[in-house]
């Protein structure tokens, strides 16, 4: 434990943060059973994003965990995910915290239905910026929409009689087609 304290103190100094903030950020990653090296990488990204967003490291570590657990496939750096949220927060009337908090609500279902991280983050930032609804409201609404489409994608008819065909017709009226030429449902990124 004393070795961890020394290492955490050194890492915190290098990142211009407190040892307490560093350990708060790393706790969730250790609880996930990650290696020391992986915890150090994730904690560094977490501390940097927390500093940029003006948010606590504990909150940011929870938010990034939801994003990484659902979108990270090794093809991009861990830092990339934080950079996208920070850039979108700077470019829109949304904040990094709003984007991360909203993504936390629907990340698990977003990837399942073919929604990329970039589109998920962009959709959330756009809706939050334009409506000024909270990230909880927007994230939960997107989760509900995606869950319904996923269920319908599997052939289910909802208790209110809603079917994929009904959704398809409503979207077609506003010029959005959800089907590929071969009849398969498009990935969410393409819809």
Give the ranges of each region predicted by the language model.
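Short edge-strand/loop segments of extracellular domains
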Residues: 145-149
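Extracytoplasmic, non-cytosolic globular domains
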Residues: 124-129
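Active-site capping/gating regions of soluble enzymes
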Residues: 121
């Amino acid at each position: 434990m004393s070795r961890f304290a020394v290492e955490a103190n050194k890492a915190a100094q290098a990142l211009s943060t407190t040892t307490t903030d560093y350990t708060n950020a790393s706790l969730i990653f250790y609880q996930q059973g990650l290696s020391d090296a992986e915890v150090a990488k994730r904690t560094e990204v977490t501390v940097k994003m927390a500093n940029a967003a003006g948010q606590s490291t504990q909150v940011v570590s929870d938010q990034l965990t939801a994003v990484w657990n659902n979108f990270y496939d090794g093809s991009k750096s861990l830092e990339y995910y934080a950079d996208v949220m920070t850039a979108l927060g700077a470019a829109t009337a949304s904040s990094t915290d709003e984007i991360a908090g909203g993504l936390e609500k629907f990340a698990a279902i977003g990837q399942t239905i073919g929604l990329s991280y970039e589109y998920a983050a962009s959709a959330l930032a756009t809706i939050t910026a334009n409506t000024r609804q909270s990230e909880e409201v927007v994230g939960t609404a997107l989760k509900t929409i995606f869950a319904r489409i996923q269920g319908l994608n599997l052939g289910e008819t909802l208790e209110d009689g809603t079917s994929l065909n009904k959704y398809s017709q409503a979207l077609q009226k506003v010029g959005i087609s959800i089907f590929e030429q071969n009849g398969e449902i498009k990935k969410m990124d393409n819809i």
